[in-house]
């Protein structure tokens, strides 16, 4: 009897979850300085969209269709399914038809009968899909199964126009269009959300500090041991098995506010565009930098050498080349101990360095060991 009494009075962790839901609802909205909701920094494992794709035909074009051989083959196959046979060797002259690829993202928990938006893109040499209609196209997933069926009239933002002399103009991209609510979901994607007694939260930006804070925040409100940080990206949380309780539990859980850990110090450089992004935590050790510009200008002109009227010789064109080298005075700026982002920006602006010069300075500081940040060149 004593053992039965102990088991009856013992509270299972999942029972603590159910009893704490009301208290959690009162506490989870407490304001925290610099805090973010869990739903903004993490996703639930297994809750994701899936890509689906298909191949079909767009008809009704105003003479802007393609002339690809696979378009002709696809059209013949479609007509055969309708019981119409096109004689071999006959050119159907498909100026109003274009072969297209159709793709879409199938949102998580999509149910049969729901509508989703689709994107239609020409795969041949069609000039424009404007005014066309997509015929019924099966959209399949990576497993080869059909999850949606697409059909409808295209909305094309781009257009093109041309003249009889061959001149033409194109605005945006007329070979790609959209069909809002253009596909109907026919099959639901299996989800692991309602299985098991745990949920896993995956951080969008893996960070050990953030994972630890999410774990502690959940355990402080629901009870010790319910949340466990698995690694820098994942936090495993015990959750009710019943679907309705699991949904309610997660709706409260995702609105908890947590202060994320500070991002690692990074400097991102786009060498093609000259864009430089400096993170907030970037610091520079004491260092002095001098950077001078050497400008070499080569100009080439042509002069005329014409002899006197009584002298022999021919008038010739003589090239005249001028090489000029200018070196601007080198300017030096110095960083004090633990210089911050503001110090770097202010010093660079005072020197008046171009983006290319800034890249060279940052790379030199990194090589010298004075730049305490990860330098990423994209």
Curated annotation (Swiss-Prot):
Q: Which PANTHER family match?
A: FLAGELLAR P-RING PERIPLASMIC PROTEIN FLGI (PTHR30381), FLAGELLAR P-RING PROTEIN (PTHR30381:SF0)
Primary location class: periplasm
* Annotated signal peptide: 1-33
Keywords (A to Z) from UniProt = Bacterial flagellum, Periplasm, Signal
Cite a single Pfam family from the UniProt record: FlgI
Name listed for the protein in its UniProt record: Flagellar P-ring protein 2
Quaternary structure, from the entry: The basal body constitutes a major portion of the flagellar organelle and consists of four rings (L,P,S, and M) mounted on a central rod.
What this protein is reported to do is described as: Assembles around the rod to form the L-ring and probably protects the motor/basal body from shearing forces during rotation.
Domain of life of the native organism: Bacteria
Compartments it resides in: Periplasm; Bacterial flagellum basal body
Q: Which InterPro entries match?
A: Flag_FlgI
Which molecular function term from Gene Ontology is one that the record holds?
A: structural molecule activity
Q: Which family does it belong to?
A: Belongs to the FlgI family.
Q: Which GO terms describe its cellular component?
A: bacterial-type flagellum basal body, distal rod, P ring; outer membrane-bounded periplasmic space
Q: Does the keyword Signal apply?
A: yes
From the UniProt record, give one GO term of the biological process aspect. bacterial-type flagellum-dependent cell motility
Q: In its keyword annotation, does this UniProt entry include Signal?
A: yes
